[in-house]
Regions:
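Short polar catalytic/cofactor-binding loops
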Residues: 13-16, 191
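Hydrophobic/aromatic beta-strand patches that form the interior of the parallel beta-sheet core
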Residues: 47, 186, 255-257, 346-350
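Active-site gating loop/helix substructures
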Residues: 135-251, 256-257, 263-276, 362
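Short hydrophobic beta-strand that contains or immediately precedes a catalytic carboxylate
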Residues: 11, 46, 232-234
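C-terminal helical/tail subdomains of lipid-metabolizing enzymes
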Residues: 146-148, 162, 167, 306-404
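Short, basic and Ser/Thr-rich N-terminal targeting/leader segments
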Residues: 5, 179-181, 343
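Acidic, Ser/Thr-rich peripheral helices and adjacent loops at domain boundaries
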Residues: 268-309
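Patatin-like phospholipase
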Residues: 2-8, 16-155, 161, 167, ...
Length: 404
């Protein structure tokens, strides 16, 4: 790679399905993917949303160590700490409050003090929730139906204490501060409804790991996380696949890891549940947003190639339209103080060929499932095919897979 060029990795959100990202990272860093010319890579730029934010921060916080060793350590964390194993008391991400079955779990049976401590805390939290909701129900002027519906709140029964502890123990702020890699994490301002991108320096020196926790706070399941007094939730609400931030950080070769397949490969269920419908709606929104970003990347290549030929008037009507749209964005970027030497971009896309479980799968942390997702991601990277997944390559338009 020539001077000024950087390799970047973009990690999407998707809860437990994030184990798939670990498999792809493992293949890329071990040099077994055709996307890297079968050469191991050690990316300089990472961006991530939700679970992708955790994976990205983990990789960046281990800067200075061989990337192969770091991905193997990340895999071990997923299979030993994140996963729900026969000897663990639940998973490493969330706990269901007041669940009596945990006392029958062999892993919990071996940790009676932890179970007792959790039970006391859960009782307190549920009592607090009941008092607050009861007061709201009694004093609200809304209709009885509206007040009854307002009592439904999954957040009351979900504790994020496990992921709080996981992030605090696995992501060192001092290590982030020393890292030579670039990191950007996406989170959504729950008050203003705007996206915020947290840089590595902001996380290490100002806001701490709360930014990573906020990026993974799935609305309706986990409560908003206050960062500098402002509530933030999952970055996937507004930007589930932060490609443009990676390009702005200087990445010229970008590896995007999606956690959902091409929409056309996901068969519509004849009798979908509400969760199925909501999940497909989100997938369509995410697909639309990231397709625009991929087209921008292809447009940057087009502009540079037309300028090299010195004859933009010879372009097709579609090329000319793309030229004008992307040229305007490049001009705005430069006028806002982001002037830089634009380079041609290479974008490789990785995604599962079938649905990983859709809505319900994002909370399924069973070890066997996570191990299978790691293997799937690894194999998909080993068998990477631009003709199937879609790539942006200099001199070529985005492949058919770019249209999700």
């Amino acid at each position: 790679m020539t001077a000024g060029e950087r390799t970047g990795v973009v990690l999407s959100g998707g809860g437990a399905d994030g184990a798939y990202e670990v498999g792809v990272l493992k293949a890329l860093t071990h040099g077994v993917s055709p996307a890297t010319g079968y050469r191991p890579i050690d990316p300089e730029v990472y961006t991530g949303t939700s679970v992708g934010a955790f994976n990205a921060a983990f990789m960046v916080s281990r800067s200075g160590r061989p990337a192969t060793a770091v991905t193997e350590e990340l895999e071990a964390v997923w299979l030993e700490r994140v996963a729900n194993t026969p000897l663990s008391c639940g998973n490493g991400v969330f706990r269901v409050r007041g669940l009596p079955f945990q006392f029958l779990d062999p892993g919990c049976f071996l940790q009676p003090f932890q179970v007792l401590t959790n039970a006391v805390q859960d009782t307190f939290d549920l009592a607090k929730f009941s008092l607050i909701k009861g007061a709201q129900f009694a004093t609200d002027d809304a209709s009885l139906q509206s007040r009854l519906l307002s009592l439904i709140d999954l957040q009351a029964f979900i504790s994020s204490q496990p992921i709080d502890q996981l992030i605090a123990e696995e992501i060192s702020l001092e290590a982030l501060r020393r890292s030579t890699k670039r990191l950007t994490i996406a989170a959504s301002n729950w008050e203003a409804g705007v996206l915020r991108l947290f840089s590595k320096d902001e996380i290490a020196d100002t806001v701490g790991t709360a930014a990573i926790l906020a990026s993974a706070a799935i609305p309706g399941i986990f409560p908003p996380v206050p960062v500098e007094g402002i509530p933030y939730v999952d970055g996937g609400v507004l930007l589930n696949t932060p490609l443009i931030p990676a390009i702005r950080d200087g990445a010229t070769t970008v590896h995007i890891i999606f956690l959902d397949p091409l929409l056309r490969n996901v068969v519509l269920k004849p009798y979908p549940s509400t969760l199925d419908t909501a999940w497909r709606m989100l997938a369509i929104i995410w697909a639309s947003n990231v397709r625009k970003d991929i087209l921008i990347a292809a447009g940057i290549n087009l502009i540079l190639e037309l300028l090299e030929r010195g004859a933009p008037e010879s372009a097709s009507r579609e090329d000319a339209r793309t030229f004008l749209q992307v040229a305007w964005q490049m001009y705005r970027r430069m006028s806002e103080g982001g002037a830089q030497a634009y380079r041609k971009l290479t974008v490789h896309v990785y995604r599962p060929q079938s649905a990983l479980g859709e809505g319900e799968g994002i909370l399924d942390f069973q070890r066997a499932r996570l191990h299978g997702l790691v293997e799937m991601g690894y194999n998909d990277a080993v068998n990477h095919d631009c003709a199937v997944n879609g790539c942006v390559l200099p001199g070529r338009p985005a492949g058919p897979g770019g249209n999700r």
